Amino acid sequence: MASINTESDDYHPIVILIDELKNEDIQLRLNSIKKLQSIAKALGPERTRTELIPYLQDSVLEDEDEVLVVLSEELGNLIEFVGGAEHAVCLLPPLQILAGAEELVVREKAVESLCKIAKEIPTSSFEESFLPLLFSLSKADWFTSRTSACGLFTVSYPRANAEMKKSLRKTFGGLCHDDTPMVKRAAATNLGSFAKQIEKESVKSEILPLFQSLSTDEQDSVRLLGVENCALLGSMLTNEENIQFILPTIKASSLDKSWRVRYMVARLLKELCESMGTEITKTELIGAFVKLLKDTEAEVRTEASLRIADVCSLLTKEMNIKTILPCVKDLVSDSSQHVRAALAQVIMSLAPIYGKEDTLTHLLELFLHLLKDDFPDVRLNIISKLDQVSKVIGIEMLSQSLLPAIVELAEDHQWRVRLAIIDYIPLLASQLGVEFFDEKLGNLCMTWLGDPVFSIREAATNNLKKLTEVFGVDWAKNNIIPKVLSLHSHPNYLYRMTTLFSISTLSTVVGGDVISSSMVPLLAKMVSDKVPNIRFNVAKTFQTIIPLLDSTIVQSRVKPLLVKLHEDTDKDVKFYASQALQLC
């Protein structure tokens, strides 16, 4: 067995790392493998090639998968430490073994490292060492090696000579017809990227038949990978070739007996439409899309619903209204809440496509329906995209039609829905104007300050800050601050706490005059609150506002209050008061 001579090493830390390669503790071995570059640098290129790499090949390759994953990755980073690209072939033997490992993640990392090396090594080394490795993996008895081989063709083909290119295509074809589904899946996964490296005539004569074979495989796990290849191959072919070779597979896959294959068509529909082109999409793919929107499986309808806006953007408005809109109307009341939630994610994006008049005519009632859905995620998804609609139909029309529903959702039993409404309020306020806001939404913003959920109260205080930035300090001084400060005497201490949070948040935008005239007097009252939590939060609030106040006010009005808090019997109050005093 290969070993590493450490007797003559002057680098004590490196000796320790080398010893840790043999340690029984897996964490120590992992630590050493992660520092393989440091070990190799200390040993030098020659000893790394003649001692370290053989040792790793003989000893470490029997290790735990966790170690092998890291080793597979690190070996690909050793090219410069073995003497550069001309010596990188010494890294191939251990990586070939790792490429045949049982654990998928180990194999994937080994293939990544092999691809990295394949791009670096000289042509002579590539032909004499790398290609034989690829052919060896392709013909290995154990399927794991053959699956790894599938990931090496794309990087190998551009560097091979004409004769070897022919052999590579033939070998890849054999893997596409392998007896093992796992190998065929690996071949299908890599077929598209491999095809991009191949000459157009060879793609048509050799790759397309392989694609059609994989797309009609008895295993649905193989067939669904063929859908992705439809998009990749379609982008390489002409319209006529797509109609002849690719379109039949897309249509067949959209009607496949396995819902997983149909799901993949729905998932990749945007890419399929783009690769096929607008004309084929309009004449051939829309029918398939409509069937997917009406699929018996909720998972397929969900995925298809997410693609509605993408597909509609490729069609004329008339075609949208005639073919897609009826499906959308059905999906609004779909039995699956996940389908409705998916639709709610994208339906607002239809407004710019439809335009103002058709949005009001065809879509507005659907928005309202979804805003009142029983499932909170549906309501949430609609709220988060309201701005897309307001840009199209105008804020006045939005406020007339959707505002009542928005106000209703502001008191929704799901706190996440209330939170989404709060986040949307500043944008809505800037569009509605101050008078409309004060009349319709002003009281609502104050209600949130007393919400039982902390996240809502916190968001509500930040909301007030944003509204002050929109409407100005004078508005806040007259409309918001008096209401916020009035909560300081509320019997529930959480409301009193909200007053303090609001002061801290608003103080950064209202200016020193408002702080000294309105906020400091209130804090002076709250210094004597009976709840210690309130008192130490008063001290924390002072920490926020002291930098914003004139020094004379700090010395004459704030410091005496902090001195009083520093004499408090509660240790937390004393602590935060002492911190605030340091700022005085």
From Swiss-Prot:
Record bears the keyword Membrane: yes
Pfam family of the protein (one): PPP2R1A-like_HEAT
UniProt key word Hydrolase: no
GO biological process: meiotic sister chromatid cohesion, centromeric; myosin filament assembly; spindle assembly
InterPro entries xrefs: ARM-like, ARM-type_fold, HEAT, HEAT_type_2, PP2A/SF3B1-like_HEAT, PP2A_Regulatory_Subunit_A
Subcellular location: Cytoplasm, Cytosol; Cell membrane
Example of a GO MF term: protein phosphatase regulator activity
Gene Ontology CC terms: cytoplasm; cytosol; plasma membrane; protein phosphatase type 2A complex; Ras guanyl-nucleotide exchange factor complex
Stretches forming HEAT repeats: 7-45, 46-84, 86-123, 168-206, 207-239, 240-278, 279-317, 318-356, 358-395, 397-434, 441-479, 480-512, 513-551, 553-584
Keywords carried by this UniProt record: Cell membrane, Cytoplasm, Membrane, Repeat
Predominant location: cytoplasm
Function noted in UniProt: Scaffolding molecule which may coordinate the assembly of the catalytic subunit and a variable regulatory B subunit. Component of the Sca1 complex, a regulator of cell motility, chemotaxis and signal relay. The Sca1 complex is recruited to the plasma membrane in a chemoattractant- and F-actin-dependent manner and is enriched at the leading edge of chemotaxing cells where it regulates F-actin dynamics and signal relay by controlling the activation of rasC and the downstream target of rapamycin complex 2 (TORC2)-Akt/protein kinase B (PKB) pathway.
Subunit structure, as described in the record: Component of the Sca1 complex composed of at least gefA, gefH, scaA, phr, and the protein phosphatase 2A subunits pppA and pho2B.
UniProt record similarity statement: Belongs to the phosphatase 2A regulatory subunit A family.
PANTHER family: PROTEIN PHOSPHATASE 2 (FORMERLY 2A), REGULATORY SUBUNIT A, BETA ISOFORM-RELATED, SERINE/THREONINE-PROTEIN PHOSPHATASE PP2A 65 KDA REGULATORY SUBUNIT
Name the UniProt record assigns to this protein: Protein phosphatase 2A scaffold subunit
